[in-house]
Amino acid sequence: MSSFSEEKYNELIQSIFLRFPSVQNVSFGEAYKPGLERMEEFRELLGNPDGRYRTVHIAGTNGKGSTASMLASALAACGLKVGIYTSPHILDFRERMRIVDGRKSSADGPSLVTEEYVYDFLTRYNDDLDRLQLSFFEITTGLAFKWFADMEVDWAVIETGLGGRLDSTNVITPELSVITSIGLDHCDLLGNTLEEIAAEKAGIIKKGVPVVVGGHPAEEVAAVFRKKAGEMQSRIVFADVVQPSLWKDHSSFIMEGMDLRGGYQEMNLRTVLASLDVLGQLSPELRITGMETAEAIMHTAVRTGFHGRWERLSSCPDVICDIGHNAAALTNNFAQLNGYLDNDTYSSLIIVYGVMADKNLEDILPLFPDRATWIFTTPHTRRAMQASEIKARYDEWCSSNGRSSAMSYVCDDVRSAVALAIRTAGQFGGNPLIYIGGSTFVVSEAMPCFR
């Protein structure tokens, strides 16, 4: 083992972020290294660790992380030790790899990879990381695969980073592939139409491995998945067509009490329950029972440590954050916020919003709730769009569409934006709601303000 210290660990992590392209410091286009050759070699160097446990592979535009975490929580309830690999992280990159041990009390929460393990892994393979010219995501993928094997997990639920066909996670051969909802995002890398993006996601479908498709895919998108499944001789299940065995008796119960809040989780829940049906058929030894499974899914956030999805940060005033950042995700989120005002759940709405410069703001501006007070902000990443630019484009859009932009402000950093939102809520009185979102980076910088 290499000599470990907290100081050495922090220095090494900082150097890894600088040496290898990641979306924390460069654009997706710069960070994304398509192709599986590097990962195949790295995986072999690590001893093909993913072959030592069974896997579920998840791709999709939105809902991957929630689906992965619910599924892992349900599998752990069968008495299994389950790894979860998701991205991005919010506060600590070790959040990307977690283990839920169903043989322990659920109150213990998940285990994160230790700093010592990360340090030893990175120092041990330091020369290989440079030789193979890996991306940051490829490094963390290898780290997760190896850690799961060393910790002797029974199953691991693996989420793709971007796309599917050429994603570094696509070296695994899973028991089940899952594709969540499809939307327009990262079009410069994945394609400009839903069909093109679906084709990239369909790349995770392996020969003879069943696939569950979630969301409500348009016919042209469903056709892409059916065609690929046919080529791979894989059984395909559309979650919105079948009636999952636990849906009728347990879906309402789960949704009412689930700690992963947000109306969009109902669609993810249906995908998870359909996936559990398929897994139960493949592996009858899995004890997927009604109430036990329902309660495990209901407490997904606590059991798996999954955060940033319609998460309440404060109750005085109410503050909700969500990392949804593309038009498809924000359509759902903003509709739910409008619903709160329509039914008088809240008397006013204040939105702290920041966005990355590579997002198509023209597709998002029409979705903005018109009764909100807006506080535009700039998170600390070179990828961010400046708050002043968001404000200027919002003003222009409002002028062209007969809306007022008077209730909109600019804060150059997230902490100041949160402070202004709280002051504004106090001035409004009544029962205000603060929503923080638009980007993972905004949420990650806002969360410490409430801890």
For the regions a language model picked out, list residue spans one by one:
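Hydrophobic alpha-helical packing residues
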Residues: 71-80, 148, 394, 398
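Nucleotide phosphate-binding/pyrophosphate-handling subdomain across enzymes
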Residues: 150, 155-160, 167-178, 182-186, ...
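C-terminal helical cap/extension that packs against the catalytic core
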Residues: 216-237, 246, 318-320, 327, ...
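Membrane-proximal helix-turn-helix segments that form the acceptor-binding/catalytic region
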Residues: 198-206
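Extended acidic/charged loop-beta regions that coordinate divalent cations
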Residues: 88, 92, 143-189, 222-257
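Short functional linear segments
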Residues: 1-60, 67-69, 73-78
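Active-site-proximal loop/hinge segments that shape catalytic or ion-binding/gating pockets
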Residues: 439
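ATP-dependent carboxylate-amine ligase catalytic core
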Residues: 8, 30-36, 41-52, 77-172
